[in-house]
């Protein structure tokens, strides 16, 4: 089986949640948010090692979460950078030399399912890169000056990116090297890989695979967990 390293991004703050604490350690139904996706990664036979990237001050707390999950697959807990892109770059440095594939997942997406992780990994093996994503359903407006609508975009063919995102290791390493050299900035890893011309497969994501960003997301997360019981 090809060796796969999974990087879990857990270095964010909770400013939009109205909190300064790292949101991935906020409790959801009595467990830290990070614990949910970590448990899926630990249980997956397709994941060989896990790298968690978090804020330097949160490394002790992250170790507690890892210990609570009995996560023997966790190879390293790495101090992240100022931005998400910087954090993933640090995580890549800790990936095992044997790794042929790298998956990246947001720790603030606690509802990752084994099925979504598996199908994204398998799709990447066919094309070299794959990401979970959902077709855009809402009408998309482009804003202009003073909050006036500048244009209505055709949503046909538009997808909203999620994680996990899975790549050939050398593709992702190349993309991050180019980004560092040329000053590229992106809000997801696929955008950097795309800039090098590599094909990225869209894998239908899941509506429940939400990213916890706002207080409303926390309410929705609680409802989703209550519905699972």
UniProtKB/Swiss-Prot annotation:
Keyword field: Isoprene biosynthesis, Nucleotidyltransferase, Transferase
GO biological process terms on file: isopentenyl diphosphate biosynthetic process, methylerythritol 4-phosphate pathway
Coiled-coil zones: none
Principal EC category: transferase
Top-level taxonomic group: Bacteria
Site location (Positions MEP for the nucleophilic attack): 155, 211
Listed GO MF terms: 2-C-methyl-D-erythritol 4-phosphate cytidylyltransferase activity
Keyword Membrane in record: no
Biochemical pathway: Isoprenoid biosynthesis; isopentenyl diphosphate biosynthesis via DXP pathway; isopentenyl diphosphate from 1-deoxy-D-xylulose 5-phosphate: step 2/6
Reaction catalysed by this enzyme: 2-C-methyl-D-erythritol 4-phosphate + CTP + H(+) = 4-CDP-2-C-methyl-D-erythritol + diphosphate
InterPro entries, alphabetized: IspD, IspD/TarI, IspD/TarI_cytidylyltransf_bact, Nucleotide-diphossugar_trans
Site entry: Transition state stabilizer: 16, 23
Function of the protein: Catalyzes the formation of 4-diphosphocytidyl-2-C-methyl-D-erythritol from CTP and 2-C-methyl-D-erythritol 4-phosphate (MEP).
Entry similarity comment: Belongs to the IspD/TarI cytidylyltransferase family. IspD subfamily.
Protein name: 2-C-methyl-D-erythritol 4-phosphate cytidylyltransferase
Organism: Moorella thermoacetica (strain ATCC 39073 / JCM 9320)
